[in-house]
Amino acid sequence: AALLREKFDDGSLQEYYDALTARNYDDLETGAMFLTEKQGGSDVGANETVAEPTDEDGVYELTGEKWFCSNIDAGAPLVLARRPEAPEGTDGLSLFVVPDEVDGEPNDLYYRRLKDKLGTKSVPTGEVELRGATGYLVGEPERGFKYMTEMLNYERLTNATGAVGIMGRALLEAKIHAANREAFGETIQEFPLMKRDLVELTVDYEAAAAFAFEAAKHYVAREADGDDSAAYRLMRLLVPVAKYRTARMAVETSSYAMEVLGGNGYVRGFTTERLYRDAQVLPIWEGTSNVLSLDVLRVLDKEAAHEALLPYVRDLLDVEHPFVESVAGTVEGRFLELQEALMTLATEDEEYAQYHA
């Protein structure tokens, strides 16, 4: 949320920016993104929360319900709402900061209930009812979805790095257990099958980390190069793919790490069962797998991201080193398959493209 205000705010919300970026715990406020409504999760344009203007410029009263709000007790959440006479769909949504307190008094936010979730228990998630809550317009009216998309890029990137974190911890737990658990007179890490599995988990972890940080590199480069640059198009393509792939890998890795620990890994109180539960949400929030796939299609179609991707991959494959020669050959074969798939998508109708996304 602080990143968003730094980019789009005109200075009128400096108070909240300072609170969100404070180093002193007593002054710190946490941010959140209240986006999902009961009738519109991924279909953001169906949101029904309304924002009525007040006599004060840039100040609105928000009325509506938000259905799945993570970090529900945030001090300065961002909320999407529709002003009177704004168009339907995402084009009519504006972005507001809705603090939990206004002039020292509680804002008109009603926390209906907390969700009883499978995992991420340490992050309170619940339903919020806005009953004429005071909200401050962020940026320009009816540009809220664009601003929120900017925030989603960042959130998807942190989702990818969070997935890498879960994979790393799960791998560590599996390695430690395998190094200490004895069976049939030796530690189980000495058995060929376990050696193979631990190596494969390690490769997956390192690949996921490399991919996530490569996407992060282009996210940072885009800040310097602007939205018309190759870095921007690569960022828009790599971030959803990194989110999609690392989330799935975290679920698989945490599941197998639990298996390595045997029955103990399945018992509450052991780290692996919590990692497994927490990993389940990674493919869901900030865009499900299908939503991300459709986003990639849009980026390829509307922003020609493949024009930046193809030379980027060719440069990566242009290496001369004996240790990566065979790997580069394997990747080059998959790269050719990717190019063929892109050509097919470009020549088929929209329904075919979505089905095979």
What does each model-identified segment do?
Residues 1-5:
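Low-complexity, highly charged intrinsically disordered N-terminal segments
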Residues 8-49, 53-58, 213-232, 239, ...:
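Internal maturation/activation junctions in enzymes
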Residues 39-42, 68-70, 87, 117-124:
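Short Gly/Pro-enriched turn/cap motifs at secondary-structure boundaries
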Residues 59-108:
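A short core secondary-structure module
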Residues 101-108, 112, 117, 124-155, ...:
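A glycine-rich, basic-preceded beta-loop-alpha segment at the flavin cofactor/substrate interface
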Residues 138-151, 176-192, 215-234, 259-278, ...:
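Conserved catalytic-core motifs characterized by acidic clusters
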Residues 156-224, 306-314, 319-357:
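Extended amphipathic alpha-helical segments enriched in small hydrophobics
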Residues 233-314:
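Alpha-helix capping/hinge segments and adjacent helical runs
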